[in-house]
Amino acid sequence: MYKTGILNSDISKLLSDLGHTDEIMIADCGLPIPNGVKKIDLALDFGKPSFLDVFHIVKSHMAIEKMTLASEMKTENESLYNVLKEEEIKFTTESHELLKQHSKHVKAIIRTGEAKPYANVILASDVLF
């Protein structure tokens, strides 16, 4: 058993296997998961665990080059948008429909219990050297 770090074995393995520019997604409980994409389901109840709880834990263990958000987040979930834009990570936005199409190409989607709209982010892995 790990003394520190991510205890969820699926997430730990996912992060260990990432190469430069590989992408993962952290999603709210309503995002449709595309066929063929690995789903790591953490959702226990509405809001539990929250998007931000999962995001901050993953961020502390992953080298992130950039993140992609739904452009609708800026107006439909402004509080989350404001938190994410303050992170020291480059980010781009695309429509929610494009983000759902983009999700077909990620290595895995980590499903949270978040029940607020547009609480989804695609994280592209960076390289440490």
From Swiss-Prot:
Any one GO cellular component localisation term in the record: cytosol
Catalytic class of the enzyme: isomerase
Residues at which substrate binds: 28, 96, 118-120
Domain of life: Bacteria
InterPro entries: D-ribose_pyranase, RbsD-like_sf, RbsD_FucU
Location(s), subcellular: Cytoplasm
Keywords recorded for this protein, A-Z: Carbohydrate metabolism, Cytoplasm, Isomerase
Principal place of residence: cytoplasm
A molecular function (GO) term: intramolecular lyase activity
GO biological process, one term: D-ribose catabolic process
Reaction it catalyzes: beta-D-ribopyranose = beta-D-ribofuranose
Family affiliation: Belongs to the RbsD / FucU family. RbsD subfamily.
Free-text function comment from the UniProt entry: Catalyzes the interconversion of beta-pyran and beta-furan forms of D-ribose.
HAMAP family: D_rib_pyranase (MF_01661)
Quaternary context: Homodecamer.
The name this protein goes by in its record: D-ribose pyranase
